[in-house]
């Protein structure tokens, strides 16, 4: 019989999945779909699980997951509107994530070279305080649109399957299909040279 306690325990397993050798994400997806799906629709834990299940299916060739988030001035931006008709890099990062910031910095030359040829970058910072994002942008000099996800309000990281990470990069084509997940700058450059 499905209970909220059981659903909460299932959520806990999603947070430990990367370290588990006995349990796969497919196992958790199956348990959720077969036992809990639709049983606790108004509960925050169920909302988390729905997003987590969706995120487990993200792969190259899939359509990107749309979201809306504010910029530093509080103006709301919808990702699909910002990247429509362009090859786009969705850069999920955080001021406290050194590797994320190095990856973002490595994309600056590509942005400068291809921004007028149909390529764009939209960065989203995962922060507790907006000031942390603003300081990082000022220090690193990101020239592209930067949005902020405060306190995981929109669950963007969960939707993209990187809830336990500082960030990740997704390259999408003009139609919104994912071309690459966590590509290096060299891989992005090779794709851009072929497509633009």
Describe every region a protein language model picked out.
Residues 63, 86, 164-166:
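Short, small/polar residue-rich loop motifs at catalytic or cofactor-binding pockets
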Residues 92-109:
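Conserved redox-active cysteine motifs that mediate thiol-disulfide chemistry
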Residues 90, 133, 176:
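Hydrophobic, well-ordered secondary-structure elements that form the walls
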Residues 112-156, 162-163:
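Conserved segment of the thioredoxin-like fold in thiol-based oxidoreductases
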Residues 1-78:
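Oxidative protein folding and maturation machinery
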């Amino acid at each position: 019989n499905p209970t909220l306690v059981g659903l909460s325990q299932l959520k806990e397993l999603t947070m430990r999945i990367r370290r588990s050798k006995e349990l796969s994400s497919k196992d958790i997806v199956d348990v959720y779909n077969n036992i809990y799906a639709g049983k606790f629709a108004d509960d925050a834990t169920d909302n988390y699980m729905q997003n987590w299940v969706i995120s487990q299916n993200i792969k190259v060739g899939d359509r990107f997951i749309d979201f809306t988030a504010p910029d530093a001035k509080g103006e709301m931006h919808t990702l699909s509107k910002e990247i429509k008709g362009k090859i786009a890099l969705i850069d999920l990062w955080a001021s406290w994530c050194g590797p994320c910031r190095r990856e973002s910095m490595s994309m600056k030359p590509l942005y400068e070279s291809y921004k007028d040829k149909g390529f764009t970058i939209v960065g989203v910072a995962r922060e507790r305080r907006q000031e942390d994002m603003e300081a990082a942008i000022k220090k690193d000099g990101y020239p592209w649109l930067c949005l902020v996800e405060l306190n995981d309000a929109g669950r963007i990281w969960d939707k993209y399957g990187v809830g336990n990470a500082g960030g990740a990069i997704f390259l999408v084509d003009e139609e919104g299909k994912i071309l690459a997940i966590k590509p290096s700058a060299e891989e992005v450059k090779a794709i851009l040279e072929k497509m633009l």
